[in-house]
Amino acid sequence: IIIDGTENFSTRYLTNDAAVILGKPYIYGSIFRFEGQVSVFLSKPFNGFDRGPCYRCLFPAPPPPGAVPSCAEGGVLGVLPGIIGALQTAEAIKLIVGISEPLIGKMMLIDTLRMEFRTVKIQRNPNCPVCGENPTIQELIDYEEFCGLRRGEVSESDDIFISPHELKAKLDAREPIMLLDVREPR
């Protein structure tokens, strides 16, 4: 079972395609600001559960680079990763034990501002290039290129971080640096 907590589109497509190729359940979780999503993508029957759509059935193509802000740029309600992670864990337990109804063919949408949880149905795409009737993607591809990034390129939404130890080393070496502190004043 693959449980995904990434916020990087190229990694999500890689994870999905690997899960489909290997026949593994893929438990997807996504967060942004006050909202989250959870689903179970299952390309082959597993422990008594029928197959359902994959991530590409729902999102056939990634958004253009920089079109979707990162969690660091848009912010995230502090408890939301824990909520989504707990729901993903519950889905994993249901798959392992073979009980209840996992979110196969469904996506749970969480809005913590309104404190609303709703579930929507999602369909398998028979023309999906990975899990469809005649798949055209049967091995892993260059996901950075697929998502519009050149190999090794940092997208506009990626953040550059430096640890306190790295900063001290640069200051001690008198390297010319520019440090911008974007923390909120207290």
Model-predicted segments: where are they?
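Generic detector of well-ordered alpha-helical packing
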Residues: 5-8, 92, 182
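E1/E1-like adenylate-forming module used to activate ubiquitin-like modifiers
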Residues: 1-84, 97, 114-116, 121-126, ...
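Short, basic and Ser/Thr-rich N-terminal targeting/leader segments
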Residues: 25, 34-36, 103, 173-176
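Flexible, polar/low-complexity N-terminal or interdomain linker segments that lie immediately upstream
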Residues: 114-186
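Surface-exposed charge patches
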Residues: 17, 94, 186
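Internal hydrophobic alpha-helix adjacent to the cofactor/substrate pocket in enzyme cavities
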Residues: 85-103
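Intrinsically disordered, low-complexity Ser/Thr-enriched
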Residues: 104-115
